[in-house]
């Protein structure tokens, strides 16, 4: 983009920012944000302690942690398809999303019942919990996208992701406080997590309304078939978004590995790992809404690619020469928070712009599947390389691959072959 184009866009951005209408967000977005916030409080109370618990207490090798992290990220991808397809075929997106939230709440009760049992049983519950997340994600994002104007998509997703991040920040803090006051009482954390998850389901029922659709969307939904769903993969508008998202996902390092290596190389205690999750979520919370607003004004693709530049800098802070604790940790979590702000909600906004209303949940599921497959593969491969060749070679290989994908994304943008922003 030429400098004059950027100057024009920044001028328009400054003018639009003074318009209160640009910042109005519908109640559905707030309702889903509250639901996600409560659900993430519940989820992160448990999940934030698992990396250190599995490796240091459970004695798992890095390869096993890679498999666990990969399944956590990408294992439930079929559930995402089921959620998207059911939501688009029935038009009952709230009910479909609600079933995913309810499944996760049931898993919290399962964690309480299995307190003190085998790691395998707990890992199985993590998988089912992530299936609940996968089931609800596409219909939830479809509700958000259908509740706002097209020029508010990234802003709306930014508001939702900010509330989601607030929950992700509070969950580890609550777990830390409970263990500090009641050492070893993991059963208390599991039960408290279940109670908060139930409150999330109640919030969805009371605060979120089903999104109305135009008659054209109803007609398209009646004709929607499995063949149409898979044909969306070849859609000229959807495919570049899917390729871009999947390519970056394939070269990312799971947060579990980032935090684990960060504390090991800094000779810090494992008790800091939950607070690293919290720090990342706080940074995400602070940046999600303004970054979403910026993406709506200047285009989402550039913001998305810039987020992965921040990810590269986060890796430099975690794995590079800066080992002065806690400043390396502060830099790492701040940059990771910026990365998530530029990628998570922004990617959903990019995809929503090119997807028709009748198949939006399925289309978003396509993108989520690409990201899940990429993260599944990257986590397993990183674990394999670490186990067989050492963590330094694994980090070097993945950061080099990230640089290559970044250069390719910038090059395709400059030649005009990139996805529309």
Task: Give the ranges of each region predicted by the language model.
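Juxtamembrane intracellular "pre-TM" segments in multi-pass secondary transporters
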Residues: 2-26, 210-244
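Transmembrane alpha-helix termini and helix-breaking/packing motifs in multi-pass membrane transporters
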Residues: 52-57, 170-190, 377-393
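Helix-to-loop junctions at the C-terminal end of transmembrane segments
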Residues: 79-92, 179, 287-300, 386-387
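Cytoplasmic membrane-interface "Motif A"-like loop-to-helix N-cap segments
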Residues: 89-101, 297-309
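C-terminal ends and interior cores of transmembrane alpha-helices
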Residues: 102-117, 309-323
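Intracellular juxtamembrane helix-capping segments at the cytosolic ends
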Residues: 135-148, 342-355
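C-terminal membrane-cytosol helix-exit motif in multi-pass small-molecule transporters
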Residues: 195-216, 405-413
């Amino acid at each position: 983009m030429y400098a004059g184009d950027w100057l024009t866009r920044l001028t328009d951005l400054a003018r639009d920012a003074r318009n209160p209408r640009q910042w109005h967000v519908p109640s559905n977005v707030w309702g889903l944000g509250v639901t996600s916030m409560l659900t993430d409080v519940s989820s992160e109370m448990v999940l934030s302690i698992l990396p250190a618990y599995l490796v240091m207490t459970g004695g798992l090798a890095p390869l096993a942690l890679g498999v666990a992290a990969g399944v956590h990220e990408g294992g439930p991808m079929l559930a995402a398809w089921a959620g998207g397809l059911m939501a688009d075929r029935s038009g009952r997106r709230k009910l479909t999303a609600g079933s995913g939230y309810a499944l996760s709440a049931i898993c919290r009760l399962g964690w309480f019942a299995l307190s003190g049992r085998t790691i395998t049983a707990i890992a199985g519950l993590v998988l089912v919990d992530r299936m609940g997340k996968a089931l609800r994600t596409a219909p939830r994002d479809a509700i958000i996208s259908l509740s706002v104007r097209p020029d508010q998509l990234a802003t709306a997703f930014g508001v939702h992701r900010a509330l989601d991040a607030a929950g992700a920040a509070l969950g580890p803090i609550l777990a830390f406080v409970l263990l500090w006051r009641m050492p070893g009482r993991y059963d208390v954390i599991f039960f408290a997590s279940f109670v908060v998850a139930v409150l999330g389901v109640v919030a969805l029922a009371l605060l979120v309304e089903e999104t109305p659709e135009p008659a054209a969307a109803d007609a398209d939904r009646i004709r929607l078939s499995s063949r149409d769903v898979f044909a969306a993969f070849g859609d000229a508008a959807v495919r570049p978004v899917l390729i871009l998202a999947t390519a970056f996902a394939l070269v990312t390092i799971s947060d579990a590995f980032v935090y684990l290596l960060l504390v090991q190389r800094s000779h810090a205690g494992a008790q800091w790992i939950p607070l690293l999750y919290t720090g990342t979520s706080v940074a995400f919370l602070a940046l999600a809404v303004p970054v979403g607003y910026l993406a709506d004004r200047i285009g989402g693709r550039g913001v998305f690619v810039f987020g992965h530049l921040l990810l590269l800098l986060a890796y430099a802070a975690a794995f590079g020469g800066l080992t002065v604790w806690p400043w390396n940790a502060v830099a790492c979590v701040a940059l990771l928070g910026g990365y998530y702000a530029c990628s998570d909600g922004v990617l959903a906004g990019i995809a929503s712009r090119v997807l028709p209303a009748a198949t939006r949940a399925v289309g978003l599921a396509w993108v989520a599947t690409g990201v899940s497959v990429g993260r599944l593969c990257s986590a397993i491969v990183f674990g394999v390389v670490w186990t067989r060749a050492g963590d330094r070679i694994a980090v070097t290989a993945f950061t080099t691959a990230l640089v290559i994908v970044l250069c390719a994304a910038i090059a395709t943008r400059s030649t005009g072959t990139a996805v529309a922003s």
